Curated annotation (Swiss-Prot):
It comes from the Bacteria. The lineage of its organism: Bacteria, Bacillati, Bacillota, Clostridia, Eubacteriales. Peptide chain release factor 1 directs the termination of translation in response to the peptide chain termination codons UAG and UAA. Belongs to the prokaryotic/mitochondrial release factor family. This is Peptide chain release factor 1. GO terms for molecular function: translation release factor activity, codon specific. HAMAP family: Rel_fac_1. Methylated by PrmC. Methylation increases the termination efficiency of RF1. The gene is prfA.
Amino acid sequence: MLERLNFIENKYEELSNKISDPSVMANQKEWQKLCKEHADLEIIVNTYREYKKAQEDLESDKEMLKEESDKELREMAQEEIKELTLKLEDLERELTILLLPKDPNDDKDVFIEIRAGAGGEEAALFASNLLRMYTRYAERKNWKVETISLNATDIGGFKEVTVAVKGKGAYSRLKYESGVHRVQRVPDTESSGRIHTSTATVAVLPEVDDVDININANDLRIDVYRASGHGGQCVNTTDSAVRITHLPTGLVVTCQDEKSQLKNKEKAMKVLKARLFEAAEAERAASIAEDRKSQVGTGDRSERIRTYNYPQGRITDHRIGLTLYKLETFLDGDIDEAIEALVTEDQAEKMKNLGRVN
């Protein structure tokens, strides 16, 4: 590990020199790329330097303990040795996590697709609850949310809805939300007071760059139509809504949020690219991982990941066995406690897999 850290520190110094070079700065695209690489290494280098300083201080205290006869100074050195030993253990653990393979999509913006599952109108209302939860969470993170497309019901639910979430680290946090979410509650329409179980499916897709995936224009069928709102009524007098069908896969994407047909087409293309990229990544991951599945979950849309139990005010994440009794605040966007636990479990699994490889 130390050899790798030394290499990273040297690379960081090299990048520091490059990004301050006027000839490099003249090429803005290259300069921005180097700046990002420099910023990505900064936290590792700073932690490593703190680790080296703590090691030096520890050796110094050990030397002092060998040579010093004064009782008070010896006790002081022993106390410092104890503190520094613990600090070094913490820093070593932190460095191990920092050196884990990074998901290249973590810094990307995302598309969240929510679809009502089993449960009819109640499932559509639950899909609406999930959209509100993610919107509130995005507000807490100062992320921007844009509606791409929606298919609303008459009483305020969503058969399906797609939104874009833009902000630093959006995918790194929201990627754990992919899967089947289950709700247990008494529907407003239920006169007998029986608890019903409904589901909604969430897919979180990273927004991909043009270089990440190439789409042949001949593989697309593009249809335009008038946008509709709640209950199906027309909300636009022009054919501004866009439906794109990817003929080889049968994937269909719609966008009607913008008044401009061109903007709707651009947004729909971004979602299509994200879906095709996700499909390609899933295929690649399956071939690499074979039968091995992450404890945190595969992110498969068919995997039941979380239950929201209204009578008990309980949320249970089935991937890691986490139970929280804070349903109201959770649905208001306070989901970081669950996400942090999932991140920690994911890191532990990666470290375990790294050990298998090594």
